[in-house]
Amino acid sequence: MKYTSSFLALLLCVLLGFSGSYGQGPFFKEIENLKEYFNASNPDVAKGGPLFSEILKNWKEESDKKIIQSQIVSFYFKLFENLKDNQVIQRSMDIIKQDMFQKFLNGSSEKLEDFKRLIQIPVDDLQIQRKAINELIKVMNDLSPKSNLRKRKRSQNLFRGRRASM
C-alpha cells in the first residue's frame, strides 16, 4: 500500500501539472511534502508505468477530459479520506484538496457536497443497487446529447432568420 500511495502522490503532481499551473499554486510545496513523506521519488515507483497520465493523453476534448478527471479527482479524495488520520501529512492534504476543489469544482461547496455524496455511495448495497437501476432511464436520458441538438436548432433558426432578412 505504501508504494501505491507514493506513486499516487507523484501522479497528483502530474495531474495538477496538466492544468497548466504546475509550480504556481500553494499546492506545489505540499505535493513536494507528500512526495517526500511517501518516498515517491524512489525509482521503484515507476514500475508498471503511470496510473493516470497515459489515460489522460487519450482524452483530447475538454468535455471528455472532464469526465476522466472527475474519476481521477474522486480517486484522490478517497485516497485523502483513507489517510485522514495521518497528522504528519494532514495539512498538505488539506491544502491540496482545497486547491483541487477550487480548480475542479470552481469553489462551489454545493458541488463539493454532491461530489462527496456520490463517491461515498456503496455499490455493494442491494437497496442502493435497486435505486440505481430504477433511476437508470433518467440518467441515460440526461446523458443523451439533447442540449447540443437544441443549440444546433437554435443556431439554424438564427441563421435562417439572418438569411431571410438579407
UniProtKB/Swiss-Prot annotation:
Domain of life, per lineage: Eukaryota
GO cellular component, one term: extracellular space
Alphabetical keyword list: Antiviral defense, Cytokine, Glycoprotein, Growth regulation, Pyrrolidone carboxylic acid, Secreted, Signal
Residues bearing carbohydrate: 39, 106
Listed SUPFAM superfamilies: 4-helical cytokines
Tissue: Released primarily from activated T lymphocytes.
Keyword Secreted: yes
Pfam families to which the protein is assigned, alphabetical: IFN-gamma
Family designation: Belongs to the type II (or gamma) interferon family.
Function: Type II interferon produced by immune cells such as T-cells and NK cells that plays crucial roles in antimicrobial, antiviral, and antitumor responses by activating effector immune cells and enhancing antigen presentation. Primarily signals through the JAK-STAT pathway after interaction with its receptor IFNGR1 to affect gene regulation. Upon IFNG binding, IFNGR1 intracellular domain opens out to allow association of downstream signaling components JAK2, JAK1 and STAT1, leading to STAT1 activation, nuclear translocation and transcription of IFNG-regulated genes.
PANTHER family given in the database record: INTERFERON GAMMA (PTHR11419:SF0)
Descriptive protein name: Interferon gamma
Lineage: Eukaryota, Metazoa, Chordata, Craniata, Vertebrata
